[in-house]
From Swiss-Prot:
GO terms for molecular function: 3-oxoacyl-[acyl-carrier-protein] synthase activity; beta-ketoacyl-acyl-carrier-protein synthase III activity. This is Beta-ketoacyl-[acyl-carrier-protein] synthase III 1. Keywords: Acyltransferase, Cytoplasm, Fatty acid biosynthesis, Fatty acid metabolism, Lipid biosynthesis, Lipid metabolism, Multifunctional enzyme, Transferase. Pfam families: ACP_syn_III (PF08545), ACP_syn_III_C (PF08541). The gene is fabH1.
């Protein structure tokens, strides 16, 4: 049986570093308040002339190089984003054109902060059923363009960035072991963008995330026939350190076994998990054969988790 996994991964980080001290000068907040409630110390914003598709392209080039796969070998491009350059054409088609991935089909996925996991689960189906050999999955957001920088409740939370993964067949003892996707439309309006900017009911989102992230992580392990004792590293959506810590505690993992890139990137929505993976790989925290649990939640309300044995 064909097993789908990640062959290579890459990221793009916004060029402008915006610290908590910078926000102290703009709105009624403080570095201590932000750190205590979110764990965020700084975030990155992309320049005005860099759009979502530009960031996606840069991350994709790095992922293709890491995978040793050419753009011409990509069969499908999946872009998870809620901040496209424009309503249409899709970001995926813009990336396809820039990469020169002429034989690739292309579509965007709107699953907010869980989008990258939705993309991996979708790519897995195409690869394991024999439909496609290589799938490029991208999580990318330019949240700075839909964030009200005068709203102290949301301005300090978000950042810009992109992460891309090239998927393909891997060894039977590597790759995606199980996934879980879910949604609860009853909470749809807790995070929305009805107007120009993001609106969020932070209290309700926090309660949902603390409960659902831990439950989903445990559920995907059960689906994979594994237990929390088998987990080598947890990569949660980098939204808020308190939510992330709740997930880690549900899995009874030590602090050093969870990614915490939220402190330097903020919440980059669908890009947060692949961006974290790139950093942890560079730092040697993810090794060949490690069992990773990826888990995220987002507007919808939606959630997703994935058990992945790292390596090819």
């Amino acid at each position: 049986m064909t097993r789908a996994g990640i062959l290579g991964i890459g990221s793009y980080v916004g060029e402008h570093v915006v610290t908590n001290k910078d926000f102290e000068k703009r709105i009624d907040t403080s570095d201590e308040w932000i750190r205590t409630r979110t764990g965020i110390e700084e975030r990155r914003f992309a320049p005005d002339n860099v759009d979502t598709s530009d960031m996606a392209y840069e991350a994709s080039v790095k992922a293709l190089k890491a995978a040793g796969v050419s753009a011409e070998e990509i069969d499908l491009i999946l872009v998870a984003t809620v901040t496209p350059d424009m309503p249409f054409p899709t970001v995926s088609t813009l990336v396809q054109q820039r990469l020169g991935a002429k034989k690739a089909a292309a579509m965007d996925i709107s699953a907010a902060c869980a989008g990258f996991i939705y993309g991996l689960a979708t790519g897995q189906q195409f690869i394991e059923n024999g439909g496609y050999k290589h799938v490029l999955v991208i999580g990318v957001e330019k949240l700075s363009k839909i964030t009200d920088m005068t709203d102290r409740n949301t301005a300090v939370l978000f950042g810009d960035g992109a992460g891309a993964a090239v998927m393909g067949a891997v060894s039977e003892d590597r790759g995606i072991l199980a996934y879980e996707l879910g949604a609860d439309g009853e909470g749809a309006m807790h995070i929305n963008q009805k107007g120009e900017y993001i609106q969020m009911n932070g209290r309700e989102v926090f309660k949902f995330a603390v409960r659902q992230m831990g439950e989903s992580a445990l559920s995907v392990l059960e689906k994979a026939g594994l237990s929390k004792e088998d987990v080598d590293f947890l990569i949660p959506h980098q939204a808020n350190i308190r939510i992330m810590e709740a997930s880690r505690e549900r899995l009874e993992l030590p602090v050093e076994k969870m990614s915490t890139t939220v402190k330097k990137y903020g919440n980059t929505s669908s890009a947060s998990i692949p961006m974290a993976m790139v950093d942890e790989l560079k730092d040697g925290k993810i090794k060949d054969g490690d069992l990773l649990v990826l888990v995220g939640f987002g507007a919808g309300l939606v959630w997703g988790s994935l058990a992945l044995r790292w390596g090819r």
